[in-house]
Amino acid sequence: MTNTRKSHPLIKIVNHSFIDLPAPSNISAWWNFGSLLGVCLGLQILTGLFLAMHYTADTTTAFSSVTHICRDVNYGWLIRYMHANGASMFFIFLYFHIGRGIYYGSYTFMDTWNIGVLLLFAVMATAFMGYVLPWGQMSFWGATVITNLLSAIPYIGPTLVEWIWGGFSVDKATLTRFFAFHFILPFIITAMVMIHLLFLHETGSNNPSGMNSDSDKIPFHPYYTIKDILGILFMMITLMTLVMFTPDLLGDPDNYTPANPLNTPPHIKPEWYFLFAYAILRSIPNKLGGVLALVLSILILMLFPILHSSKQRSMSFRPLSQCLMWMLVANLLILTWIGGQPVEHPFITIGQLASVTYFFIILILMPSTALMENKLLKW
């Protein structure tokens, strides 16, 4: 008689995905971030659901309802801060996950990679709309500034902005629709994650060497289930330390002031995980140019499979490319720092240089260095 997990129509899908899945024997801790992102998504949906039970999407009561959650709801403060800091953890893991993909050449799985980039856009949209919901000063002005960027689109721009706002400014209609989208998007993301995994399981996982590992596979369970659980444990320790000791460390103090359309905060800036893109946006003095640079800074990820010019898949055995990879990481950290600084000298110049360097490394230095390495290896 066949084992139920191998014969049951539903359980066998789980079995082929998480239990009997043949996995490379040498994947490192960099391959833990996929499962950590899955746990983060589950945690965000769960905490978000409980927050939605007490939140009211109305301009007059939104701010008060968040205060009510923190003060009066049983463990409301815990749920709220787990949700807010969970988003930060989500993005840390996302960036590590993408960085891993770039370093080890995982982008050669083009279907998996492209749906991953779309997932990144969906998560960024969800996080942006979630930041608007507490209806603090930074929520309101962040929403105003970012939605206003669409007015740079020729011809249809201004109409499009008013259509998204549901009026002539960010108001009640905007908040209500942002709540609706913020609620539904995580479920769409979950469906996209399933497609992401479907494409991944068509090819099997990549590994640090970048070589085919069909000759050396091990079952996912128990080897990688236990490894994932260890990763989840570390994640929960980090998250709960953040939530319990410094819950507002990554937030903006301005968001503890209720939204006021008549008073602009001195420095409008998004959450830390968008600062690199915000710095690129601000570095171009033209509105449309800035918006294009902003979109391209993320969309450029889709070019990685096309720009790959090395005969080797991974960067594991390519020291020059490794140097460039870490230059790119340092560059992104500089952009993140600049995004949080006021628009004044010398930050403007640093931001412009870092923005140019970002595109220069990806579009020119990385492919040309890969070609040079091929030559050095007489390939």
UniProtKB/Swiss-Prot annotation:
Entry keyword Transcription: no
Cofactor binding, note field: Binds 2 heme b groups non-covalently.
Binding-site list for heme b b562: 83, 182
Gene Ontology MF terms: metal ion binding; ubiquinol-cytochrome-c reductase activity
Transmembrane segments: 33-53, 77-98, 113-133, 178-198, 226-246, 288-308, 320-340, 347-367
GO cellular component terms, semicolon-separated: mitochondrial inner membrane; respiratory chain complex III
The keyword Transferase is annotated on this UniProt entry: no
Lipid bilayer topology: Multi-pass membrane protein
Matches recorded under InterPro entries: Cyt_b/b6_C, Cyt_b/b6_C_sf, Cyt_b/b6_N, Cytb/b6-like_sf, Cytochrome_b, Cytochrome_b_C_euk/bac, Cytochrome_b_N_euk/bac, Di-haem_cyt_TM
Positions contributing to heme b b566 binding: 97, 196
One Pfam family here: Cytochrom_B_C
SUPFAM superfamilies the record matches: a domain/subunit of cytochrome bc1 complex (Ubiquinol-cytochrome c reductase), Transmembrane di-heme cytochromes
Keywords: Electron transport, Heme, Iron, Membrane, Metal-binding, Mitochondrion, Mitochondrion inner membrane, Respiratory chain, Transmembrane, Transmembrane helix, Transport, Ubiquinone
Cofactor(s) required for function per UniProt: heme b
UniProt-annotated binding residues for a ubiquinone: 201
Note: Heme 1 (or BL or b562) is low-potential and absorbs at about 562 nm, and heme 2 (or BH or b566) is high-potential and absorbs at about 566 nm.
Functional note: Component of the ubiquinol-cytochrome c reductase complex (complex III or cytochrome b-c1 complex) that is part of the mitochondrial respiratory chain. The b-c1 complex mediates electron transfer from ubiquinol to cytochrome c. Contributes to the generation of a proton gradient across the mitochondrial membrane that is then used for ATP synthesis.
Listed name of the protein: Cytochrome b
Source species of the chain: Ctenomys talarum
